[in-house]
């Protein structure tokens, strides 16, 4: 479970509310029989908990909850999505707008290139989620924003040209086999090499920065 704290407030207010959130989540999980694992951690801007429990099959299992407190303000307003689960009542889930959500995924793919990142971005391309010029412009601008403020690049310098994607090229099939395939449906086929090719082609066309965007990146660097 990956959450963002989205209250626009100063650090002192955030820390106060953060403690309330901590207490509420820990109390709820413990009352439902989940046990906090020793590996849980709470660094400066992140709460990361791992809870152990016994699943319906009687096996030991775990659930991870992470709350990010550094990205409190977003580009676009959050949206509410209705989620239908067959054996539960319908629920509303608050999430980032699709454009902003996939901008963060593209940033993660370029920076760290986890197996799930290429899967998510490939499905965005495959299903043509953003087809109009306006949508693609918004996606590019949001991506450029997160490439600067949320970059995981080791050299901390955001490029202004994107003609190749070395981090994506470093992904190997053993990563896909061990990290991605176990969580996909058995009937789902994921063509890894095709996904890499199509994603890199899409990104090379998307990330053609305007002069003003290049100037923004240079000033930020």
Question: What do these predicted ranges mean?
Answer:
Residues 3, 7-221:
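Structured mid-to-C-terminal alpha-helical surface segments
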């Amino acid at each position: 479970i990956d959450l963002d704290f989205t209250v626009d407030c100063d650090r002192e207010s955030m820390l106060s509310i953060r403690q309330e959130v901590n207490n509420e989540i820990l109390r709820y999980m413990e009352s439902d029989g989940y046990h906090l694992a020793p590996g849980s951690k709470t660094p400066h801007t992140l709460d990361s908990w791992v809870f152990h429990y016994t699943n319906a099959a009687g096996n030991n299992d775990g659930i991870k909850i992470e709350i990010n407190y550094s990205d409190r303000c977003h580009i676009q307003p959050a949206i509410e999505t209705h989620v239908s689960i067959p054996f539960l009542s319908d629920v509303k889930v608050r999430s980032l707008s699709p454009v902003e959500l996939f901008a963060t995924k593209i940033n993660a793919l370029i920076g760290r290139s986890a197996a799930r990142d290429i899967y998510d971005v490939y499905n965005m391309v495959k299903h043509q989620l953003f087809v109009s010029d306006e949508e693609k412009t918004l996606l590019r601008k949001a991506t450029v924003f997160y490439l600067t403020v949320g970059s995981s690049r080791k050299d901390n310098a955001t490029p202004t040209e994107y003609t190749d994607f070395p981090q994506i090229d470093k992904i190997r099939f053993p990563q896909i086999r061990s990290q991605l395939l176990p969580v996909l449906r058995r009937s789902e086929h994921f063509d890894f090499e095709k996904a890499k090719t199509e994603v890199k082609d899409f990104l090379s066309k998307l990330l053609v920065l305007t002069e003003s965007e290049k100037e923004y990146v240079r000033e930020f660097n």
